[in-house]
A protein has these predicted regions:
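Bacterial Sec-exported substrate-binding components of ABC uptake systems
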Residues: 4-7, 20-76, 180-208
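Bacterial Sec-type N-terminal signal peptides, specifically the leucine/valine-rich hydrophobic h-region
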Residues: 14-17
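A short, structured surface patch at a secondary-structure boundary
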Residues: 69-123
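Solvent-exposed, acidic/flexible segments
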Residues: 71-74, 117, 135-138, 159-166, ...
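Binding-cleft/active-site segments that stabilize strongly anionic ligands or cofactors
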Residues: 102-157, 205, 211-212, 217-286
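Extracytoplasmic substrate-binding proteins
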Residues: 141-213
Length: 286
């Protein structure tokens, strides 16, 4: 009897443990399923961001969240996407590029979509992007590209400032992938660096120039080099001139007459691989 009682008790204990194990397993499995469902509910399929339309007006644009297929026809956007670590999602890029982004041009898996000035619409369509990034040079193609996929058109605003504009654009792009914290980390020191440069620039005059097609152009505070006169604070001696694109051509005599303490030059020819840069250096690089 005692042996039988022990056997029965052992059997009951075993059954109890098995039942507990099954209950715990069921609970764990149920919890995992619930967590996955909750994550799916929390991760949206689409989000809305602030972008520009063909006229450069700010609009609310619906884009896919965490897109897997991206077409890029803007170097600034490509730079941001590359820095965010989502370059593997790029299925097509402009043939126009910078040396440190050339992997996206030389990569056989990335389709050639034309240039940052003229998109190959057929090539864009063939790579089946979920979203397309463009810059100002392709604003005229905005509507045609929008028929293929949502078009994210971002730019810099001189009034806002180059650094703040770039940061804002990076935050916008990052929000499409849930990578906002990455942008905060990468831009954390921008303001401090600008403050240091601004202190050095106080009371000093400068000319801001660009070599392009063999000529030397002077830039105002409304162009792509506005960071020097607006945010850093050098007294740009041609600040009032309207020079939003490539600036106004200037002679060597003009530079001498202005007599700046500093001259900042952006070599556009070298940046885009044009041959004309040699002449610009010969004439103004002494």
């Amino acid at each position: 009897m005692r042996k039988l009682a022990k056997v029965l008790l052992a059997g009951v204990a075993a059954l109890s443990l098995t039942a507990c194990g099954q209950a715990e397993g069921t609970t764990g499995s149920s919890a995992d399923t619930t967590a996955k469902e909750q994550k799916q509910q929390e991760t949206p399929e689409k989000i809305k961001i602030q972008s520009l339309n063909a006229n450069g007006e700010e609009i609310s644009l619906e884009v896919p969240y965490d897109p897997e297929r991206i077409a890029v026809l803007d170097m600034a956007a490509l730079d941001i996407l590359d820095n965010l670590g989502v370059g593997d999602k790029i299925v097509g890029s402009a043939s126009t590029s910078l040396e440190y982004l050339s992997d996206y041009v030389d990569n056989e898996k990335v389709a050639n979509l034309g240039t940052i000035k003229e998109a190959d619409l057929e090539a864009v369509m063939e790579c089946e992007p979920e979203v397309i990034f463009i810059g100002g040079r392709l604003a005229s193609s905005y509507d045609a590209l929008s028929e293929i996929a949502p078009v994210v058109y971002l730019s810099t605003d001189v009034e806002t400032g180059v650094v703040k504009s770039v940061t804002k654009n990076a935050e916008t792009i990052a929000s499409m992938f849930g990578l906002e914290d990455e942008v905060k980390e990468k831009t954390a020191g921008f303001d401090e660096r600008i403050e240091v440069l601004a202190e050095k620039a106080k009371g000093h005059t400068a000319l801001v120039g660009m070599t392009t097609s063999g000529s030397f152009n002077l830039m105002g505070n409304d162009g792509r080099c506005s960071i020097i006169g607006v945010e850093i604070g050098f007294d740009n001696l041609t600040a009032a001139e309207s020079t939003s694109t490539h600036g106004n051509e200037a002679s060597f005599e003009t530079v001498v007459e202005k007599n700046p303490e500093y001259i900042f030059v952006m070599d556009r020819d070298q940046a885009i691989g044009a041959d004309g840069g040699t002449d610009g250096k010969r004439n103004y690089g002494k």
